[in-house]
């Protein structure tokens, strides 16, 4: 089974829960909520709606998976998961948590009392990417049965077990400021299908600025085999995107704010707005119409 959702609510909860049946709760990374609040989240969601939970940063960033202190915070996360009926708890370590701390991670995962929880771990940073480190990590995660979390456009998980958990952070130079093209989502589908099996569920969580749109398009592709139109087409598509910022605005501001967004020139061709605006004069524009006069495609 493939499950699709977003990291946090990019739109209102009602609209989100009408579209998806999965969300990763991110606010728990910054503050442990009251149980009464958590119960309300569960009660207000549809019965078949699934929560996953991101563990508080004290576990990973402050205590760096060191026993005792990290274990205490882990125990505090369990009632949150239980009251949400969440079966997955995500631990995300920072890029400063490098492979030389693997022993601490192994001891932590061996020591936690998971009960019904599946604990998954997202490593961050380039130090985890060389083959020797990946093989060592695979051996440890398999031994403690902790699925590895990655962005599949950067690297595939070294171990999944019964759950593959993927988090998409954006692929551009500014990462989060990114929109996935139909071509990229088609490749994502290929990756996801290669991980899915009768014994393994695949969770796909989008965590980029256009996460709601991208996750919706990916869900539609999974269900129908086709992508819905991204926007209007041709000049109308450009107008639609240009209308999303305030004017007057400089070229550099426009490029920074919305240059990463995709334009559909026709049914077969998507380009980023920044490609169309690259050669327009560097000046202040009073409105979208002034920009359109300078654009050729």
Features from the language model and the residues they span:
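Residues lining hydrophobic/aromatic ligand-binding pockets adjacent to catalytic sites
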Residues: 1-233, 244-245, 264, 286
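Basic helix-extension-helix modules of the SAP/HeH family
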Residues: 229-297
């Amino acid at each position: 089974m493939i499950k699709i959702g977003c990291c946090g609510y990019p739109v209102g909860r009602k609209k989100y829960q009408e579209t998806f049946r999965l969300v990763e709760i991110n606010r728990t990374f910054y503050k442990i909520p009251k149980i009464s609040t958590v119960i309300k989240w569960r009660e207000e969601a549809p019965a078949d709606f699934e929560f996953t939970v991101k563990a508080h940063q004290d576990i990973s960033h402050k205590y760096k998976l060191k026993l005792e202190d990290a274990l205490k915070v882990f125990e505090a996360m369990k009632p949150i998961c239980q009251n949400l009926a969440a079966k997955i708890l995500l631990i995300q370590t920072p890029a400063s948590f490098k492979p030389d701390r693997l022993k601490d991670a192994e001891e932590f995962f061996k020591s936690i009392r998971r009960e019904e929880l599946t604990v998954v771990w997202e490593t961050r940073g380039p130090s985890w990417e060389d083959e020797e480190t990946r093989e060592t990590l695979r051996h440890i995660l398999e031994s403690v049965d902790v699925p590895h979390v990655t962005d599949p456009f950067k690297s595939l998980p070294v171990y999944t077990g019964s759950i593959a958990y993927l988090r998409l952070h954006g692929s551009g130079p500014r990462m989060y400021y990114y929109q996935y093209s139909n071509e990229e989502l088609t490749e994502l589908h290929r990756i996801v299908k290669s991980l899915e099996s009768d014994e393994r569920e695949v969770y796909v969580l989008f965590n980029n600025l256009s996460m709601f749109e991208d996750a919706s398009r990916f869900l539609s592709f999974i269900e129908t085999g086709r992508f819905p139109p991204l926007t209007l087409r041709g000049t109308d598509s450009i107008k639609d995107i240009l209308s999303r910022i305030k004017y007057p605005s400089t070229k550099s501001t426009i490029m920074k704010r919305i240059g990463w967004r995709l334009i559909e020139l026709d049914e077969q061709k998507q380009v980023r707005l920044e490609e169309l605006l690259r050669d327009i004069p560097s000046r202040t524009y009073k409105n979208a119409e002034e920009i359109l006069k300078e654009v050729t495609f």
